[in-house]
């Protein structure tokens, strides 16, 4: 990367103008995207305009199109909805309306349009672009614009960001707003669960999503619902019979409640709608259960955006500006979307076409095709749901294997969800599943018991670790561990935990040379708030911790905004890993985030103080600085606080907050529940396969490197990687992987906080095609 290229990003937008609008239904996280578009646009030297009230504002012009400033997008990151307003616009559907919109853009010299909305809004934008030259011709003929203006605005660049709570847009794994909508739904489901258990009730919950069952499907996975109705996969013709049998079976197993999730577009095989009332009447009539219906409605669109949506919106906004400014008359209108944790650019019309194909397939009752078109992520969710909710464990355990599940390290939200799915998938496969209490220590002491189906009932939504977890490593107690492996006939180990789970795995590999009993397959599922396990881009529990930090930062910023001229220094957890500090910095709009991976000196601290001094001269009179707990042994939180207090005398005062163990607590977020559930299922499927492969002469013998793995999410796929192969990628002294993907997001944090830095554009997304993405390895 040459210095010239580095510098190019800062001058990329000079002489250009970008307009940003939000259209269609609002979604949480739209404000994060608007803020990123405005700030990165200004950073590149472009002028940026707000278009208020969506396409209606574009058509009406006047005060609806206003130039944005750096400060005009301050304090909007944590707000739900869209601050610049949205409207469903009839005028823009007519050519006359689009002509007026073109006139309003040309007069302001705007040739770049960033549209944040659903598929309808994006299709409208593409139509507008394809007609652009004709519209200019008409305006010239009518004498409304000069030839010079027409030449200057000869082509229109369009980039779309998908903002929709339904996640119904093909080509992106997550749309802006989906994660926050899931947060709202899960909060409600958790609240309803307690009342349902008290009265032994059945609840039928109707969630939004139009013709897409994503919200309903993920909700049912995240709360362990008994049944889900989604439009893409209508139930079989005798579903009434199956549903009632399933509900009464659950009650027989000792459950005090039933939860049924219905997508608002749910239909049967003949395309006839299935309503919540129909289901309620059926359950009351056939089973006589006390049944209530709750329609969640617009609650799902409201509230604060989750950390995931704020980061997604910010990343997509940055990418959108780059795509617009790099655009030429020949580049097609594109959508910036998410694949795994990678930002990708896809041709807008290809995505719209596939989205329409889903609707068409459903109308033609080709449900299998509709499911495939929704993408790998959707299909994986559906497969895991079907296994957990509809397959019964076999009665006989003949030819079964024994697998033990344990937690290692510090507690992390989502551990219990991973244990639940591991245990249940194991039972479904006909295995005996044992649970080990208190990690490797419990394995050595024999704190082991068999788990049945209902042992893990209701665990998905519970935080912490119900099995108990310890940081103890196995090496010291190999003899006792080997004895217990023989005593309980353990043939495979699923280890759910943080860095200790990984190092424990390495020790088990080492111990195989001495103890034959340790020659059994094992798999590590990364679960730690620090997100520092080699071999995985994400760990179970990190998303929950991130949201906890985010909520706290929002409250602290609000306090600072009230007092004025105040800077807060907040210390986050994570050991030496700066993931939480960096991502929370992005999600909470921090001015700086100090981390171990990016060494800093006293000069950097001084520069940050200078930066805050300048900031206090603007209308935004507050500061937020995050510091990872082990970023530097000498520049402690107290040191930074004292430095800021001294240097800021008379200009701002400082306060400090150490967040501590609250970051490990709380009920798991939908992302962590879902991720943990799928990781558990995937791990158990792998385990069954490898046990069969390692079965020789009546016993298990696994001593190959690939029989001890970490299951991790890498870019776009879930992969099993031998722990021994990951050794070279690990910095053991600081307990972090040598390469971390999220470090590439650090410059975004600095630009959004108004630092003059060089932006490396070499890693920006390139245009891909949707067909390739669908056939490639899917994300979780």
UniProtKB/Swiss-Prot annotation:
Its EC number is 2.7.1.11. ATP binds at residues 25, 88-89, 118-121. Allosterically activated by ADP, AMP, or fructose 2,6-bisphosphate, and allosterically inhibited by ATP or citrate. GO terms for molecular function: 6-phosphofructokinase activity; AMP binding; ATP binding; fructose-6-phosphate binding; identical protein binding; metal ion binding; monosaccharide binding. Homo- and heterotetramers. Phosphofructokinase (PFK) enzyme functions as a tetramer composed of different combinations of 3 types of subunits, called PFKM (M), PFKL (L) and PFKP (P). The composition of the PFK tetramer differs according to the tissue type it is present in. The kinetic and regulatory properties of the tetrameric enzyme are dependent on the subunit composition, hence can vary across tissues. Interacts (via C-terminus) with HK1 (via N-terminal spermatogenic cell-specific region). Residues 402-780 are annotated as: C-terminal regulatory PFK domain 2. The active site is at residue 166. Substrate binds at residues 164-166, 201, 208-210, 264, 292, 298-301. Residues 391-401 are annotated as: Interdomain linker. Its cofactor is Mg(2+). GlcNAcylation decreases enzyme activity. It is found in: Cytoplasm. Its main location: cytoplasm. This is ATP-dependent 6-phosphofructokinase, muscle type. Keywords: Acetylation, Allosteric enzyme, ATP-binding, Cytoplasm, Glycolysis, Glycoprotein, Hydroxylation, Kinase, Magnesium, Metal-binding, Nucleotide-binding, Phosphoprotein, Transferase. Glycans are attached at residue 530. The modification N-acetylthreonine is found at residue 2. The modification N6-(2-hydroxyisobutyryl)lysine is found at residue 557. Belongs to the phosphofructokinase type A (PFKA) family. ATP-dependent PFK group I subfamily. Eukaryotic two domain clade 'E' sub-subfamily. Beta-D-fructose 2,6-bisphosphate binds at residues 471, 528-532, 566, 573-575, 629, 655, 661-664, 735. Catalyzes the phosphorylation of D-fructose 6-phosphate to fructose 1,6-bisphosphate by ATP, the first committing step of glycolysis. Mg(2+) binds at residue 119. InterPro entries: 6-Pfructokinase_euk, ATP_PFK, PFK_vert-type, Phosphofructokinase_CS, Phosphofructokinase_dom, PKF_sf. PROSITE patterns: PHOSPHOFRUCTOKINASE. Residues 2-390 are annotated as: N-terminal catalytic PFK domain 1. One of its GO terms (cellular component) is membrane.
